[in-house]
Amino acid sequence: SSNVQRPGHTMSESSVGKEFDRIFTNCNKRIIVATFASNIHRMQQIINSAVKFNRKVAVVGRSMLNVISVASELGYLNAPEGTLIDIDKIGIYNPEQLVIMTTGSQGEPMAALSRMSTGEHKKVQVTPDDLIIFSSSPIPGNEKSVGRVIDELEKLGAEVIYNQLADVHVSGH
C-alpha cells in the first residue's frame, strides 16, 4: 500500500467534500478539478458541491467519461438532470458557473490536464480566471511530472490548490 509507512490514520473521505464546499463557497472563478477517473465517490463529491453552488459540470478525459457513463447507468453516480454538460457547451457559461472534472492528476503527458497546462488542449484553455484543484497526491515516482504541470498552470495565471495546501484528497490506501 502506498501509505503503509505513514504513522497515524487517514482522514475520512467526507472531509474532502466539506473542503470542496469551503472552496466553492468563496470562488468566483471557473473550477477545474483533477482526480482519478476510478474514484467514483470523489467525482460524486465534486458533483454534489457543484450542484450546491449552482455550477454546471463538464467532464474531460476519455477514461473519466467512460467511468461516469457506466457508474451513472448502474446507479453509483448521481447528477441531477442538466448538471452534466458537454465540454463543447462551456463557452455559453460564465466562469463562476462551471466546474470541469478532468483526468491528469498524476501529470501524465497525454492526459487532459497536462495538455491544458501546455495550451495544447482543443477545448479548454487555462486562464487567470481558473482555480485548479489537484484532488489527489502524486503516486511515488510521479512527483516531478505533477510539479511540472503545476508550474505550467501557474505560469498561465491559474490558481492551483493541491493536497499540501488544502484537504482536497485522502488516501484510499
Q: What label would you give each PLM region?
A:
Residues 1-173:
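Acidic/His-rich, metal-assisted hydrolase cores and their charged scaffolds
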